Amino acid sequence: MKEDFLHYLWKYKKVPLNTVLTTGERLQILSFGEYNSLSGPDFQSAQLLIGEQQWAGNVEMHLKSSHWYVHGHESDPAYRNVILHVVWEHDIEVFDANNQPIPTLELQGLISPELLERYNTTVTSHYQFIPCEKEYTTVPAITLLSWNERLLVERLEEKATAVNELWKAANFDWEKVLFCMLLKSFGGTVNGEAFLQLGKHLDFSIIRKERSHPLHLEALLLGQAGLLPEETELTYPRELLRNYYYLQQKYKLSAPVVKIHFTGLRPQGFPTIRLSQLAQLYELNEGLFSQILEVNDFKSIQKLFAVGVSEFWETHYTFTKTSKKVKKSISASLITLIWINVFIPLKYAYYQSLGKDVSESLIEELKTMTAESNSIITQYQQLGVSVATAFDTQVLLQQYKHYCQSKRCLDCAIGISILGRK
């Protein structure tokens, strides 16, 4: 058992309103108070009747009475106004700073066996994927509807926090933020962080100045990534190298120390190809940030990302080996991921900075997008969970990462719904 189960019992009023303390005194709960998620006692502003005396103050909870001393509450001023100590097992008398006994309520024996059985079955039992996997699909649709929207807003807020940190680091330049986020997406799982560091390290004003020179832009990105060959007999790589040396001198560039990987990637996802595509994206689109604020459907975004690679990369994946000529456009799946992981959180953070809440319109936007495909989503589908759009997948990913993995069932509407059944 975990302490959060005691919080659940108190918060959702699963404790008898009329009972007795460990001393045998009569206890009547007039108000359970408000849950406190910050430091200090677990519940504040509770109202109790102990014997004939009415009390108002805080309630603290532990699995055992002795944990009061384990946590050092006896010397903490924040706990001086505790009027009730709620425990699962009363194993020791507890005294306040004035050496007065603190009224204690032992819950063991007061909770219905059915509720305990549901708790043990759902939260503490062995499972393969998530704790509620056997009962997930039995949760009422109305519960899921409100919970899913809350999860999505949580996810938007979480991503907006990261965007805002990037915005501050970029001296409040939204174009630079977009550039960094696009680099991370183009880098994918393998090179995302390395590409992000490239973006952070590079002065975006150079991209603005050089975007009308395709060779310069590609040389800049490949050179900063450390991907240009030191020696080559091929004409195009030599041109890139020459242009990069020129840009190095012109802008006094220093390349960040990052490790770019090819291993484990399909050729279409090689960093050389991705950086060439990104260079072409910026060559063909001036003021890209203002454009992404306007697009909200896949067709428009696909048109924006209708770019390829420079001629050399049509017959190469690396600088050393020629390959069959293949059109290397940005795939629909990558465009969808960029829409979900770049455009949506960036729009949310941008409009939030202007004091506007666009969460509802972004939720509707996500509901028009194709569902993502990954191992976590597949496992939810195997439970019988319906996954139709990116809204569904984003909700499930947020739930899995922040609730299921850490077994926060008692903070989850699904877990509470299952536990609360009669």
What is the predicted role of each segment?
Residues L151-V395, R408:
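Hydrophobic, aromatic-lined core segments that form the binding pocket/scaffold
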Residues V82, V86-L144:
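Compact, glycine/acidic-enriched structural inserts
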Residues Y8-S66:
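N-terminal ordered "arm"
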Residues H62, V87, Q108-L110, S185, ...:
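Structured loops at beta-to-helix junctions and adjacent beta-edge loops in soluble globular domains
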Residues Q394-K422:
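Cysteine-cluster motifs in flexible loop/terminal segments that predominantly coordinate metals
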Residues D42, A46-E93, N98:
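A broadly used, surface-exposed interaction patch
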Residues S65-H67, H90-I92, I111-P113, G188, ...:
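Short loop/turn segments at secondary-structure transitions that flank enzyme active sites
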Residues K2-H7:
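Low-complexity, highly charged intrinsically disordered N-terminal segments
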